[in-house]
């Protein structure tokens, strides 16, 4: 019985160690985050599909919740910043009004990509459907492939 309890305890400790290690990004990722967001404290880290993701409050974005993505080498791939409808460029909101009037709700997120390009992710909702579209700042629909997936 004593061996059994020791074995179970050991396995439990190993599981905890491995699960915790996956939530701590490598030093290169932490350093990139600190360089890119020196005024922000790192928040909740997660790791999926080869990408380290951190959600945090950023002073540069009106203390809003921001999510930044880094690859395993510490390269900053993109940043997701939720936007109020009033802060989104007019061509984007105009296009949503004209092309998606059947949707009762639209949430906007600006995605700043590493190369300097930005796209707006528009999550549209109504009673029966959800749809996500991507637009550039001129309101043109575009394809977006997340570099962190």
Predicted feature residues:
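Bacterial Sec-dependent N-terminal signal peptides
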Residues: 1-24, 33
């Amino acid at each position: 019985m004593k061996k059994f309890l020791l074995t179970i305890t050991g396995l439990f400790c190993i599981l905890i160690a491995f699960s915790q290690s996956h939530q701590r990004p490598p030093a290169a990722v932490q350093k990139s985050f600190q360089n890119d967001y020196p005024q922000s404290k790192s928040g909740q880290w997660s790791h999926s599909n080869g990408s380290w993701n951190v959600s945090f409050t950023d002073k540069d974005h009106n203390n809003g919740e921001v999510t930044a993505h880094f690859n395993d080498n510490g390269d900053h791939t993109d940043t997701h910043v939720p936007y109020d409808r009033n802060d989104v460029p007019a061509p984007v909101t105009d296009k949503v009004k004209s092309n998606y009037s059947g949707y009762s709700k639209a949430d906007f997120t600006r995605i700043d990509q590493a190369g300097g390009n930005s796209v707006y992710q528009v999550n549209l909702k109504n009673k029966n459907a959800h749809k996500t579209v991507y637009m550039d700042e001129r309101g043109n629909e575009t394809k977006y492939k997340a570099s962190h997936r």
